[in-house]
């Protein structure tokens, strides 16, 4: 999209407080049961999507049963074309944009509901589209449904100041004006809004809207109470709020700004000061109760003194808050895109800024401020798993359910195809003793993104750690069976053979796995190396025949000449060090000389330009192995250092990436 979601409604009409006699009054349940308090993150297990539940089911569970007037067969003519595009590729954001634009233009309610509901399963952070959806319901006079859409949106993105403002304007338009219940509902909504989003650095317009509304109602004491809160929160317009607060104090009488208790306490404080100066008698003898009129003789002086003291108290709050703002200002200026977008961040700098800001807040801020900053971060960087992982890691020291909630949102909504987040979620559940939940997370992800070796191996290790050896073996056998290439099949065969030999202590079965793999992938050096390593682990005297058979398979097989010579040299060394028959040693030596002559012949042909050297046709890793082994020979290492040879081939982890493309984002 060319325009950001945050900008879509920047110039839109925020609504008015106009009357609407045709709209029925809507009864609003208690917000506390419906709007997530992002400062706590103490979610119950039922509040977070289950690891094995469908994401769509989780999202749709929040929707009300909406009455419709159109049958599905009456969908607009082009709907199916747009729908198939996003159904085939839910990550095609442009396809979603075209679909939603189309259903809006057609003004087809049922088609719009289907499109918007499915869209928000994948992109719940697009605040502008929640507004579009709610407006669509409202245009069809579905006030209750519009209200529900707003509530679902605020559950999905409770830090959206703009969405809160749109919702409050919606309530002003649709609730009965002048009704006490209406005021209670709106004030309650304001309270939930500032609890959820009021500590956001850019939440000023929400606070200002709250203050203006209380002023309109004539609730000066409530205005003061709101100022008491905002003047202690680091926000972008902190200085503006303090200036408006001073105007609020100067333009109204102190007794109208303060509660009765605050008013009495302030008068006593000032009277006490005057008493010490000798101006008045003991403050307790002649102080009024605080509710009768102030003496005309003292009226002007006392009012000004009280105003001065009120501002003085709040000046201290302002000074401290200004210091807190200054510590965060540079970080806030570095946030160029505070809203969600599918496009990557333009440069590395925004990511670095987020990381440094989070580290600063973790070190210096309260838990509430840290959580709010993380929530802001994962809106802007929702498609970057590193920030979700950092968030979950932070929550480990505060709330087990908080960790689970973070992982659940990341994996089921925003990062359905990112392996690391899923693997860490599964590991977390395993740590908590939820073994079956860990299984489900890994299995579900593997079904979503096929062919990831790292996930299959994590499933195997999970079963092994908990004593399910048969299941671990079955998972590896299944991976061999469904491998897309011989190379992949050989990789899993090596893993299975090592599992059978090291864990289950079943040498014959392990040997069979590797021999079968060699028959299918005769040029894979790793198979021979692992077979040799396994045979060497047994009694050398009793297992001499199997070791020699392994050498012969490599020497007489399809490996490049250089690797065959290497195996031949190792065979000679083995017979020299451990062999029981000198005839076998002499035969091995003669065979080795024959291979060297064959290599010389090939080199001469290559030098004459008649044939490409065979070793250049080999895999890079096989050539590297041969070069290392040749280096050992040149160093005159008499001992058969098989351990070093084996380790060389596993210096670098297996390249899982060759079996799957990077998951789409």
UniProtKB/Swiss-Prot annotation:
Annotated region (Disordered), positions in chain: 1-28, 599-625
GO biological process, one term: mRNA processing
InterPro entries linked: HAT (IPR003107), TPR-like_helical_dom_sf (IPR011990)
Keywords assigned by UniProt, alphabetized: mRNA processing, mRNA splicing, Nucleus, Phosphoprotein, Repeat
Subcellular location: Nucleus
A Pfam family of this chain: HAT_PRP39_C
Modified residues (Phosphoserine): 44
Tree of life domain: Eukaryota
Polar residues: compositionally biased ranges: 12-22
The keyword Nucleus is annotated on this UniProt entry: yes
HAT repeats: 107-139, 141-173, 181-216, 218-251, 331-363, 365-397, 402-434
Main location: nucleus
GO CC terms in record: nucleus
Residue stretches of biased makeup (Basic and acidic residues): 1-11, 599-622
Job of this protein: Involved in pre-mRNA splicing.
Family: Belongs to the PRP39 family.
Name of the protein this chain belongs to: Pre-mRNA-processing factor 39
Phylogenetic classification of the source organism: Eukaryota, Metazoa, Chordata, Craniata, Vertebrata
